[in-house]
Protein backbone atom coordinates (compact mmCIF):
# COMPACT_ATOMS: atom_id res chain seq x y z
CA UNK A 1 0.00 0.00 0.00
CA UNK A 2 1.33 3.44 -0.94
CA UNK A 3 1.89 5.95 1.90
CA UNK A 4 -1.00 8.23 0.79
CA UNK A 5 -3.34 5.24 0.55
CA UNK A 6 -2.32 4.10 4.04
CA UNK A 7 -2.90 7.58 5.48
CA UNK A 8 -6.26 7.83 3.73
CA UNK A 9 -7.31 4.42 5.13
CA UNK A 10 -6.21 5.44 8.65
CA UNK A 11 -8.17 8.68 8.29
CA UNK A 12 -11.31 6.83 7.19
CA UNK A 13 -11.03 4.58 10.23
CA UNK A 14 -10.58 7.57 12.58
CA UNK A 15 -13.50 9.45 11.02
CA UNK A 16 -15.70 6.36 11.37
CA UNK A 17 -14.82 6.19 15.06
CA UNK A 18 -15.69 9.86 15.51
CA UNK A 19 -19.04 9.42 13.74
CA UNK A 20 -19.88 6.60 16.17
CA UNK A 21 -18.82 8.59 19.24
CA UNK A 22 -20.75 11.64 18.06
CA UNK A 23 -24.14 9.87 17.83
CA UNK A 24 -25.29 10.94 21.34
CA UNK A 25 -24.79 14.57 20.26
CA UNK A 26 -27.35 14.14 17.45
CA UNK A 27 -25.10 15.33 14.60
CA UNK A 28 -26.75 17.27 11.80
CA UNK A 29 -23.64 17.32 9.64
CA UNK A 30 -19.97 16.41 9.99
CA UNK A 31 -17.63 18.17 7.57
CA UNK A 32 -14.07 17.10 6.76
CA UNK A 33 -11.91 20.14 5.97
CA UNK A 34 -8.25 21.09 5.85
CA UNK A 35 -5.48 19.07 4.24
CA UNK A 36 -7.41 15.79 4.13
CA UNK A 37 -10.29 17.48 2.27
CA UNK A 38 -7.90 19.25 -0.11
CA UNK A 39 -5.82 16.11 -0.65
CA UNK A 40 -2.50 17.69 0.35
CA UNK A 41 -2.18 15.82 3.66
CA UNK A 42 1.08 14.37 4.94
CA UNK A 43 2.14 11.99 7.70
CA UNK A 44 2.04 14.86 10.22
CA UNK A 45 -1.37 16.23 9.16
CA UNK A 46 -4.32 16.34 11.52
CA UNK A 47 -7.73 15.17 10.38
CA UNK A 48 -9.83 18.33 10.74
CA UNK A 49 -13.56 17.90 11.28
CA UNK A 50 -16.42 20.27 11.99
CA UNK A 51 -19.25 18.63 13.94
CA UNK A 52 -22.54 20.52 13.85
CA UNK A 53 -25.04 18.93 16.21
CA UNK A 54 -28.16 19.61 18.24
CA UNK A 55 -26.82 18.36 21.58
CA UNK A 56 -23.71 20.32 22.37
CA UNK A 57 -22.16 21.52 25.63
CA UNK A 58 -23.52 24.84 26.90
CA UNK A 59 -20.02 26.26 27.19
CA UNK A 60 -18.67 27.68 23.92
CA UNK A 61 -15.09 26.58 24.64
CA UNK A 62 -16.30 23.03 25.34
CA UNK A 63 -18.22 23.05 22.02
CA UNK A 64 -15.17 24.17 20.05
CA UNK A 65 -12.80 21.68 21.65
CA UNK A 66 -15.12 18.72 22.35
CA UNK A 67 -12.59 17.10 24.71
CA UNK A 68 -14.23 13.65 24.56
CA UNK A 69 -13.67 13.54 20.80
CA UNK A 70 -10.01 14.61 20.95
CA UNK A 71 -8.92 11.18 22.19
CA UNK A 72 -9.08 9.81 18.65
CA UNK A 73 -5.52 9.89 17.24
CA UNK A 74 -4.85 12.69 14.74
CA UNK A 75 -8.47 13.91 14.83
CA UNK A 76 -9.11 17.57 15.60
CA UNK A 77 -12.81 18.28 15.83
CA UNK A 78 -14.61 21.57 16.42
CA UNK A 79 -18.24 21.64 17.48
CA UNK A 80 -21.05 24.07 16.73
CA UNK A 81 -24.78 24.28 17.20
CA UNK A 82 -26.56 24.62 13.82
CA UNK A 83 -27.69 28.25 14.28
CA UNK A 84 -24.31 29.13 15.74
CA UNK A 85 -22.46 27.94 12.63
CA UNK A 86 -24.85 29.85 10.35
CA UNK A 87 -24.22 32.94 12.48
CA UNK A 88 -20.46 32.43 12.05
CA UNK A 89 -21.03 32.51 8.29
CA UNK A 90 -23.24 35.61 8.42
CA UNK A 91 -20.63 37.33 10.60
CA UNK A 92 -18.12 36.44 7.86
CA UNK A 93 -15.77 34.54 10.13
CA UNK A 94 -13.27 33.12 7.73
CA UNK A 95 -12.79 29.88 9.64
CA UNK A 96 -16.40 29.03 8.73
CA UNK A 97 -15.69 30.08 5.14
CA UNK A 98 -12.70 27.73 5.00
CA UNK A 99 -14.76 24.87 6.41
CA UNK A 100 -17.51 25.29 3.81
CA UNK A 101 -15.32 26.19 0.81
CA UNK A 102 -13.02 23.19 1.08
CA UNK A 103 -15.21 20.93 3.19
CA UNK A 104 -16.57 17.51 2.35
CA UNK A 105 -19.70 16.45 4.23
CA UNK A 106 -19.09 13.05 5.85
CA UNK A 107 -22.64 12.65 7.10
CA UNK A 108 -25.54 15.04 6.76
CA UNK A 109 -29.28 15.33 7.36
CA UNK A 110 -29.73 18.14 4.82
CA UNK A 111 -28.26 20.96 6.93
CA UNK A 112 -25.14 21.16 4.76
CA UNK A 113 -27.23 22.28 1.78
CA UNK A 114 -28.60 25.18 3.87
CA UNK A 115 -25.09 26.07 5.05
CA UNK A 116 -23.69 25.89 1.52
CA UNK A 117 -26.54 28.05 0.22
CA UNK A 118 -25.88 30.71 2.87
CA UNK A 119 -22.16 30.62 2.01
CA UNK A 120 -22.81 30.95 -1.74
CA UNK A 121 -25.19 33.89 -1.12
CA UNK A 122 -22.55 35.70 0.97
CA UNK A 123 -19.84 35.07 -1.63
CA UNK A 124 -22.07 36.54 -4.35
CA UNK A 125 -23.36 39.48 -2.28
CA UNK A 126 -19.94 40.60 -1.02
CA UNK A 127 -17.75 39.57 -3.96
CA UNK A 128 -15.74 37.23 -1.76
CA UNK A 129 -12.87 35.31 -3.31
CA UNK A 130 -10.53 32.72 -1.84
CA UNK A 131 -6.85 33.64 -1.93
CA UNK A 132 -3.92 31.27 -1.31
CA UNK A 133 -3.69 32.45 2.31
CA UNK A 134 -7.05 34.00 3.12
CA UNK A 135 -10.08 35.71 1.66
CA UNK A 136 -10.77 38.99 -0.18
CA UNK A 137 -14.01 40.93 0.21
CA UNK A 138 -14.68 43.18 -2.80
CA UNK A 139 -18.07 44.58 -1.72
CA UNK A 140 -18.25 45.14 2.07
Predicted regions and their residues:
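Glycine-rich beta-strand-to-loop/alpha-helix junction loops that act as flexible
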Residues: 33-35
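Short hydrophobic/aromatic beta-strand micro-patches
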Residues: 50-52
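Catalytic core of pol beta-like nucleotidyltransferases
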Residues: 1-29, 38-43, 54-140
Amino acid sequence: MLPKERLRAEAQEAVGLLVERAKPLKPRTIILFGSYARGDFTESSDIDLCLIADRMPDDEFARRTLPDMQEIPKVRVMGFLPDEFLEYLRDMRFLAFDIVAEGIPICDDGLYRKIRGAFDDLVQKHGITKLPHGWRISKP
